[in-house]
């Protein structure tokens, strides 16, 4: 009986030790709406911060801006009088209202993530860590966004890292 109890205890401890994670389905976005799936990003709680593990395809090669946006929607909305892809996601997650884009380790937007790197085959599989984000609860019901082009993690010379249009989006549930 003692061995059985120890086995049950070990199973409970091992099961409880699993890190919380969430798989986010990612879709292409345009000013007309949400398009085809390009894969997923699994977000896992780690002792170093939230880890974002992409399994994405059909992306332009190179670096891309990668952010958490304030609202959990990938639908288009009107900005400056014209329809804009995934505009309903709002801006970068910034609960402290810093108004600054300083990258994942800076004191600005909490939604600033390390750049997403896409290989020459259009695939992104390299995980990145967001050290300031510790819990999935912080980003629940927000949007995960891939922007066209790189991100210099600054508001200079262009705002929001100089990244381009919103290219792919998924809602973190």
UniProtKB/Swiss-Prot annotation:
One GO MF term: copper ion binding
Subcellular compartments: Periplasm
Activity response to pH changes: Optimum pH is 6.8.
Record-linked SUPFAM superfamilies: Cu,Zn superoxide dismutase-like
GO biological process terms held by the UniProt record: removal of superoxide radicals; superoxide metabolic process
Protein keywords: Antioxidant, Copper, Disulfide bond, Metal-binding, Oxidoreductase, Periplasm, Signal, Zinc
Binding-site positions, Zn(2+): 92, 101, 109, 112
Biophysicochemical property: temperature dependence: Highly thermostable.
Enzyme Commission code(s) on record: 1.15.1.1
Positions that bind Cu cation: 67, 69, 92, 147
Matches recorded under Pfam families: Sod_Cu
Signal sequence region: 1-19
GO cellular component: outer membrane-bounded periplasmic space; periplasmic space
Catalytic EC class: oxidoreductase
Regulation: Inactivated by diethyldithiocarbamate. Inhibited by cyanide.
Cofactor binding annotation: Binds 1 copper ion per subunit. Binds 1 zinc ion per subunit.
InterPro entries reported in the protein's UniProt record: SOD-like_Cu/Zn_dom_sf, SOD_Cu/Zn_/chaperone, SOD_Cu/Zn_BS, SOD_Cu_Zn_dom
Cofactors (names): Cu cation; Zn(2+)
Stretch list, region Disordered: 72-113
Reactions mediated catalytically: 2 superoxide + 2 H(+) = H2O2 + O2
Subunit description: Monomer.
Family under the similarity heading: Belongs to the Cu-Zn superoxide dismutase family.
Function: Destroys radicals which are normally produced within the cells and which are toxic to biological systems.
Name of the protein this chain belongs to: Superoxide dismutase [Cu-Zn]
